Amino acid sequence: MAEEADLLGQDSDGDSEEVILTPAELIDRLEQAWMNEKFAPELLENKSEIVECVMEQLEHMEENLKRAKKGDLKVSIHQMEMERIRFVLSSYLRCRLMKIEKFFPHTLEKEKTRREEEPPILSPEELVFAKEFLANTETYLKDTALKHMPPNLQKVDLLRTVPKPDLDAYVFLRVKERQENILVEPENDEQRDYVIDLEEGSQHLMRYRTVAPLVASGAIQLI
């Protein structure tokens, strides 16, 4: 994995900018996305560019291994590293698919109503999957139950019947960049709002809703 990876990011003005990552930095980005996706209660912004770059790097590694001497200890080490990367990548993608299936109407609605300058939640492939899952669910409900009900009961609002992600769930996090004046909202009427600072390297247990913007910006890492 000697090749560098090119990622397209966005600057503060919303314009695309190219980010050059070393292979080690690329895998670190993948692992961060994997951990955040595993522990966040909602579906996060898709990282399709990271996924594509990692897959390209795996192809380069396979080509390099084909040219390496058989029996070389380095070959075995690289093969184990490739399997580890494949595991992280497949686990990340499976986690996203599970969330899409679990929250599909809410995910599609959020994707539909997001502003143009906001990053997409779903990759093009995930969007197709979510729409097909929605259509198949509606067809199944209609064929197995709804068509046998009175006309006034033959419609179902999936946004109301399918549970939403629990944004008030508590998550463990590690602070990557110091944050000041984080507003913590009360959990009941007897409490008041208060403000805290999050020191770099510190770990906390907090409500996801409070730190969701920091997860999106990369300022904190879910653990």
UniProtKB/Swiss-Prot annotation:
GO biological process: DNA-templated DNA replication; double-strand break repair via break-induced replication; inner cell mass cell proliferation
InterPro entries assigned to the protein according to its UniProt record, in alphabetical order: GINS_A (IPR021151), GINS_bundle-like_dom_sf (IPR036224), GINS_Sld5 (IPR008591), SLD5_C (IPR031633), Sld5_GINS_A (IPR038749)
Region (Important for GINS complex assembly): 166-223
Domain of life, source organism: Eukaryota
Entry GO CC: CMG complex; cytoplasm; GINS complex
Modified residues (Phosphoserine): 12, 16
Protein name per Swiss-Prot or TrEMBL: DNA replication complex GINS protein SLD5
Gene that this sequence comes from: GINS4
